């Protein structure tokens, strides 16, 4: 005998279903469920009197040897990803996403492709949003505490360079040479994130570059503070082509060795990741932003200029001075810093992100960026652009799915593709590492509820350890068992070059983490950037710094207020 309930009753029990819209935090963005994998009436739910009990949604006969039996099931999750906004159960096995589908007991339930057995644990995601762990590809490894801060914001992968609080690291994402790379690969064993390091890309002698790739670097960073000359860039790209690694470029702000055109002539048609493409973070003044129009440039923003607000310009001068070891008593140093801060290009940056011309967002951690705000600032830009520019094509009232898919791609799948790790991380897809973030919708983009890393809970909001229930105050982020003992290594990956992987660098250094080789990088182009691959004609007026897209001036007004801000940080 069937039982009918209202949609609001259903939603209160099992979360939203097809046609329901969910507001993201206190933004103006609404995600609408496109598909529900559930078989209505056969939902898997855990708790007293619920369906996941022996002989009901839990199969009493199966063992873990059955390939369909999950170690962990996340039930009734609303998944937001670059290519889907769906409701489903997520099966995890051996630390990897096994299946997205319908969980339960196939002996008594229809359409089950994830089996719950005696060996299965449950995380209830009814009414919650699930996303892939974020990827920050512009990290200065200045302070190891960055990792925990980033993790608690929903980031699970860091790519960049550094050796600690050295002047070189404070200014550049470089881990220079085999000795430093080996030391940092050993240090990564104690970090709760997936990690990849970039070496120093300045050397005419290819041996000095190649030895860093052999030592485990997943790419090379060419940075103006070490000399971003056309020659250095050309040699770095030659090595990158030989070893299938990425080049990250912080171009020449001072235009000493050439202008933007000379840099692009040196690049030719070879792919590279252009850091902070707007230019406030560094790069050819005033027109680095034009590089985003090239088919071989994968452009990203760093988060201090996102979104453009009434405070953005004022805070940037001091940030540039400190980060790049400049002296306020030297007029040329002041001029250097001042040349990078242009309100016109900053005002255009948000619009270029919204148009899908800029493909990624990253932090620039402690080097003009905030490591724990990549996700928050991405969604603030999305909110602000909807406020100023209206709905994107294909979106409608209470349905911002196209904009949401565009923006989530900026810190998940696109950075993964750019650095050759998209086979392992970057989306909620079968076969990928189970780096999964659960959010209460009201806190989406600001404070995750649970962080699953490699299939095990790594951190979560939890109460006093002496409390009688897990919600006893003070509620705060606490490390979980995924960060203890050998789990710290077994739940995360260290990314290395293919040549380092093939030469067993893990054995050489005694590494215990999962090592994975980066690959499929050198054939990339902008068209590989999901939902963010526009290549319009871009121009910058050299006198006024105004930005034009296909001949039309683009700009935005500075925000005076934003969502996802003070109300979330009262305590």
Swiss-Prot record:
UniProt-annotated binding residues for Ni(2+) 1: 138, 140, 221, 364
CDD domains: Urease_alpha
pH dependence: Optimum pH is 7.0 in phosphate buffer.
Pathway where it operates: Nitrogen metabolism; urea degradation; CO(2) and NH(3) from urea (urease route): step 1/1
Domain of life from the UniProt record: Bacteria
The keyword Hydrolase belongs to this UniProt entry's keyword annotation: yes
PTM comment, free text: Carboxylation allows a single lysine to coordinate two nickel ions.
Ranges for domain Urease: 133-571
Binding sites annotated in the UniProt record for Ni(2+) 2: 221, 250, 276
Thermal profile of function: Optimum temperature is 55 degrees Celsius.
Gene Ontology CC annotation, any one: cytoplasm
Subunit structure of this chain's protein: Heterotrimer of UreA (gamma), UreB (beta) and UreC (alpha) subunits. Three heterotrimers associate to form the active enzyme.
Family under the similarity heading: Belongs to the metallo-dependent hydrolases superfamily. Urease alpha subunit family.
HAMAP family referenced in this protein's UniProt entry, alphabetically: Urease_alpha (MF_01953)
Name of the protein described by the UniProt record: Urease subunit alpha
Gene name of the record: ureC
């Amino acid at each position: 005998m069937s039982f009918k309930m209202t949609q609001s009753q259903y939603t209160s029990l099992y979360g939203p279903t097809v046609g329901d819209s969910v507001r993201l935090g206190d933004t103006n963005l609404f995600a609408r469920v496109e598909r529900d994998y559930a078989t209505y009436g056969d939902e898997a739910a855990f708790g007293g009197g619920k369906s996941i009990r022996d002989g009901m949604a839990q199969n009493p006969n199966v063992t873990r040897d059955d390939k369909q039996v999950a170690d962990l099931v996340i039930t009734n999750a609303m998944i937001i990803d670059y290519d889907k906004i769906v409701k489903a159960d997520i099966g995890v096995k051996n630390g990897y996403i096994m299946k997205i589908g319908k969980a339960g007991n196939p002996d008594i339930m229809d359409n089950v492709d994830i089996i719950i057995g005696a060996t299965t644990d449950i995380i209830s995601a009814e009414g919650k949003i699930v996303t892939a762990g974020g990827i920050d590809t512009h990290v200065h490894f200045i302070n190891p505490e960055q990792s925990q801060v980033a993790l608690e914001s929903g980031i699970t992968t860091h790519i960049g360079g550094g050796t600690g609080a050295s002047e070189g690291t404070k200014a550049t994402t470089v881990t220079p040479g085999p000795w430093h790379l080996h030391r940092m690969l050993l240090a990564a064993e104690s970090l709760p994130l997936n990690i990849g390091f970039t070496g120093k890309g300045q050397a005419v002698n290819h041996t000095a570059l190649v030895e860093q790739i052999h030592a485990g670097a997943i790419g090379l960073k060419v940075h103006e503070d070490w000399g971003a000359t056309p020659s250095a860039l050309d040699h770095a790209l030659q090595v990158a082509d030989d070893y299938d690694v990425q080049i990250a470029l912080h171009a020449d702000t001072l235009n000493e060795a050439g202008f933007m055109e000379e840099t692009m002539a040196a690049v030719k048609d070879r792919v590279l990741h252009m850091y902070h493409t707007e230019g406030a973070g560094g790069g050819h003044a005033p027109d680095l932003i034009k590089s985003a129009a090239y088919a071989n440039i994968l452009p990203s923003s760093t988060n201090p200029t996102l979104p453009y607000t009434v405070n953005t310009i004022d805070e940037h001068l001091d940030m540039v001075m400190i980060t790049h070891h400049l002296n306020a008593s030297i007029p040329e140093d002041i001029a250097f810093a001042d040349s990078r801060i242009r309100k016109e290009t900053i005002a255009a940056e948000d619009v270029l992100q919204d148009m899908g011309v800029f493909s990624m967002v990253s932090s620039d951690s402690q080097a003009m960026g905030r490591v724990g705000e990549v996700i928050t600032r991405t969604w603030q830009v999305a909110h602000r652009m909807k406020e100023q520019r209206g709905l994107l094509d294909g979106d409608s009232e209470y349905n911002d799915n196209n904009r949401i898919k565009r923006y989530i791609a900026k810190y998940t799948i696109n950075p993964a593709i750019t650095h050759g790790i998209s086979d392992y991380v970057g989306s909620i897809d079968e076969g990928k590492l189970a780096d999964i973030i659960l959010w209460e919708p009201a806190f989406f983009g600001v404070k995750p509820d649970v962080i699953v890393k490699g299939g095990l809970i790594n951190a979560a909001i939890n109460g006093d350890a002496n409390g009688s229930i897990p919600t006893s105050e003070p509620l705060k982020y606490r490390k979980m068992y995924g960060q203890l003992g050998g789990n710290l290594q077994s739940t995360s990956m260290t990314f290395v070059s293919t040549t380092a992987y093939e030469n067993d660098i893990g054995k050489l250094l005694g590494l215990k983490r999962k090592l994975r080789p980066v690959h499929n990088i050198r054939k990339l182009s902008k068209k590989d950037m999901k939902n963010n691959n526009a290549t319009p004609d871009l121009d910058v007026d050299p006198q006024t710094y105004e930005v034009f897209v296909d001949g039309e001036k683009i700009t935005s007004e500075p925000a005076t207020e934003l969502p996802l801000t003070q109300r979330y940080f009262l305590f």
